[in-house]
Design a protein with these regions (language model features):
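A residue-level marker of the well-folded mature domains of exported/periplasmic proteins
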Residues: 1-175
């Protein structure tokens, strides 16, 4: 059993991540199912409160995935409070500054983010290409790791520069 958090309902990226996670889960893990519709909220307190409710209602839940950076630490707090650290998986998009204590305790084993410096550099490279009149199309190389072969769809440029964070590499990031 799993519960998804989609963070801010106004954020298209959160909706896309949630939809993608659900699709992947249905394809790869057909015996796993959602216990509820994706939970909405964009604060650590909201994630904590909702996770407490989900854990109370579905004590056999196996995991949570959060798309807003506030979700994993809020969920992890509820998981620890319920005494279920190690029994309930918690992951999603987060920052080291928010989740390092939960990584160290093992309540969160891994989470993902995009390095804002790399994303900013890629956006500057993209802006430079646009100003020079260069074609922005599938395969465009923005010269930044993870943005060497971007996908372009509906005026949106997608890279593959996510960073998976664990206790092994969390000290590499100071944000």
């Amino acid at each position: 059993w799993i519960c998804y958090y989609d963070g801010n309902a106004e954020a298209a990226s959160h909706q896309q991540w949630t939809e993608g996670a659900i699709k992947r889960q249905e394809e790869k893990y057909p015996d796993m199912y959602q216990v509820c519709d994706p939970v909405e909220g964009s604060s650590q307190e909201a994630a904590y409160s909702a996770a407490k409710e989900v854990i109370a209602t579905y004590p056999e839940i196996g995991g949570f995935i959060g798309c807003d950076t506030n979700d994993p630490p809020g969920i992890a707090m509820a998981v620890e409070e319920a005494g279920k650290a190690g029994d309930i998986a918690v992951t999603g998009t987060c920052l080291v500054s928010q989740a390092k204590d939960y990584l160290n305790s093992g309540t969160i084993k891994t989470f993902t983010f995009w390095d804002p410096a790399d994303a900013g550099e890629a956006m500057c490279s993209l802006a430079e290409k646009v100003l020079k009149g260069e074609a922005i199309e599938d395969g465009v190389d923005l010269g930044v790791a993870g943005y060497e072969k971007c996908t372009v769809k509906d005026n949106t440029v997608y890279g593959a520069a996510w960073v998976d964070v664990t206790t092994d590499n969390m000290s590499d990031y100071d944000f």
